[in-house]
């Protein structure tokens, strides 16, 4: 790309050296730089890109964007100094990839819980009604039904996001469903993306180690909505959960058309006459266009909210007949690792769920309680080097179960015994055990169980690894549960 065109939107404080004519790529990782690249120095939580300029130049960078002067041979590379490289990288990424979001309908979904399920349902509704789609979030990057990459974060970095949108647009995609995390918003990973529809699921206790308070957490989440009017080139719509305690906070800070959904409060899209079954949920959908009978394979009240959010989001933008959307809902698959029931031996009912917050765990357990014939056994853990205040609340939520196994999701660098002790502090009864090894915890749950027991393995969903210190160690809850079940009950 022409270098002058690329940097034209930057706020440049100083330029040292002659600009190269063209730039072949952009990177903030000095190890991924190639010939004729632009390297941008980002100050992260653990490393500072300004310290890796020499390596970037050695690998082929011909232009360096930084916040301060660095040791650089300007005969080899040009130095551009800007006030804020986090904002600069968003501008550069959008420009380099030719602002793909301007020509896409992008659904952004944020909230503490439900982002993956709602984006999955939105994606299904769109593809089922013959629209070309991309899905971006916790489970990776998908165009139509082809999976292109996995993801380490709910919201990828700004360069990756723009590149994914660029690839999607080039492959004929017209609509994108995208998860939007609070970290992604706070760290500017979504700057430069022109969202069309913003959907709010709910807000509850999470990430307070990072945000400090629920008020700061909400202020970060609401950025998705307050920024909708910045790009006036599209009709923008916000879809809000009328039943959530933070509804009015989001409503007051949203400068575009608002559509509401809910169960208990009056809303534009409302579910009533809800019936829960072992393998499905049904309800009557009340809308401005009349009422419709909805059937879904998804379980629990929280999934009724997820279905409502998705239907409202798609209908208000696409005007697809509600009869068609309701029909499509019947075929919506359960997202992997989201209240996913395993086909296991031993006549045990084993569910894998990503629930890793007190609110999500409570809702997952409540969705199973009506079908409890014998015992409910819950495996619950939490991660190291993360919000400690959430730990006793998770154990308290799990205490509804007949037997609880406390374990660890991703210990990272923290002492596992400290994590387990924090969890124990929230237990309300003595029918529990602590097992540091997550595989052993899953095995204990299955071994302790009897026929017709329900086993909920919560916290990691479909994640294929555990983070132990700096290493990712292969681990998948569903795979381990099936292995243990088949080993313990081979002939049942």
Swiss-Prot record:
Pathway: Cell wall biogenesis; peptidoglycan biosynthesis. ATP binds at residues 111-117. GO terms for molecular function: acid-amino acid ligase activity; ATP binding; magnesium ion binding. InterPro entries: Mur-like_cat_sf, Mur_ligase_C, Mur_ligase_C_dom_sf, Mur_ligase_cen, Mur_ligase_N, MurE/MurF_N, UDP-N-AcMur-Glu-dNH2Pim_ligase. The modification N6-carboxylysine is found at residue 221. One of its GO terms (biological process) is peptidoglycan biosynthetic process. Signal peptide: none annotated. UDP-N-acetyl-alpha-D-muramoyl-L-alanyl-D-glutamate binds at residues 30, 154-155, 181, 187, 189. GO terms for cellular component: cytoplasm. It is found in: Cytoplasm. Gene3D superfamilies: Mur ligase, C-terminal domain, Mur-like, catalytic domain, MurE/MurF, N-terminal domain. Belongs to the MurCDEF family. MurE subfamily. Catalyzes the addition of an amino acid to the nucleotide precursor UDP-N-acetylmuramoyl-L-alanyl-D-glutamate (UMAG) in the biosynthesis of bacterial cell-wall peptidoglycan. This is UDP-N-acetylmuramyl-tripeptide synthetase 2.
């Amino acid at each position: 790309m022409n270098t002058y065109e690329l940097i034209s939107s930057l706020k440049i404080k100083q330029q040292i050296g002659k600009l190269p004519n063209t730039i072949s790529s952009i990177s903030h990782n000095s190890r991924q730089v190639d010939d004729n690249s632009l390297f941008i120095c980002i100050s992260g939580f653990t490393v500072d890109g300004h310290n890796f300029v020499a390596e970037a130049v050695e690998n082929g960078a011909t232009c360096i964007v930084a916040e301060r002067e660095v040791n650089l041979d300007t005969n080899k590379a040009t130095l551009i100094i800007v006030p804020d490289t986090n904002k600069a990288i968003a501008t550069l990424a959008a420009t380099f990839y030719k602002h793909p979001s301007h020509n896409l309908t992008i659904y952004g979904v944020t909230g503490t819980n439900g982002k993956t399920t709602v984006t999955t349902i939105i994606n299904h509704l769109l593809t089922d009604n013959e629209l070309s789609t991309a899905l971006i979030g916790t489970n990776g990057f998908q165009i139509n039904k082809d999976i292109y990459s996995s993801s380490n974060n709910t919201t990828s970095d700004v360069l990756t996001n723009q590149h994914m949108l660029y690839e999607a647009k080039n492959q004929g995609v017209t609509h994108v469903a995208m998860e939007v995390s609070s970290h992604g918003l706070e760290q500017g990973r979504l700057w430069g993306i022109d969202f069309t529809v913003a959907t709010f699921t709910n807000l509850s206790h999470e990430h307070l180690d990072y945000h400090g308070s629920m008020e700061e957490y909400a202020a970060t989440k609401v950025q998705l909505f307050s920024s909708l009017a910045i790009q006036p080139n599209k009709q923008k719509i916000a879809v809000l959960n009328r039943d959530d305690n933070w509804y009015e906070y989001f409503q007051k800070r949203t400068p575009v058309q608002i559509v509401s959904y809910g169960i208990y409060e009056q809303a534009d899209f409302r579910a009533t006459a809800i019936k829960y079954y072992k393998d499905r949920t049904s309800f009557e959908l009340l809308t401005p266009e009349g009422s419709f009978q909805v059937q879904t394979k998804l379980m629990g009240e929280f999934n009724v909210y997820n279905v409502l959010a998705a239907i409202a989001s798609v209908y208000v933008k696409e005007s697809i007949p509600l009869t068609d959307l309701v029909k499509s809902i019947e075929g919506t698959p359960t997202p992997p690792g989201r209240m996913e029931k395993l086909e296991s031996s031993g006549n045990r009912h084993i569910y894998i769920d990503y629930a890793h917050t007190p609110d999500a765990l409570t809702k997952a357990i409540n969705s199973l309680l009506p079908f409890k014939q014998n015992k409910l056994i819950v495996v619950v853990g939490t991660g190291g080097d993360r919000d400690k205040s959430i730990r006793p609340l998770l154990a308290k939520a799990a205490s509804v179960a007949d037997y609880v196994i406390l374990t660890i999701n991703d210990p990272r660098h923290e002492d596992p015994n400290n994590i387990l002790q924090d969890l124990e502090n929230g237990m309300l009864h003595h029918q529990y055990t602590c097992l540091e090894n997550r595989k052993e915890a899953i095995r204990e749950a299955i071994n302790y169980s009897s026929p017709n027991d329900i086993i909920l393995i919560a916290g990691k969903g479909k994640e294929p690894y555990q983070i132990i210190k700096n290493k990712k160690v292969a681990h998948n809850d569903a795979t381990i549960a099936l292995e243990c079940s088949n080993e313990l009950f081979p002939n049942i």
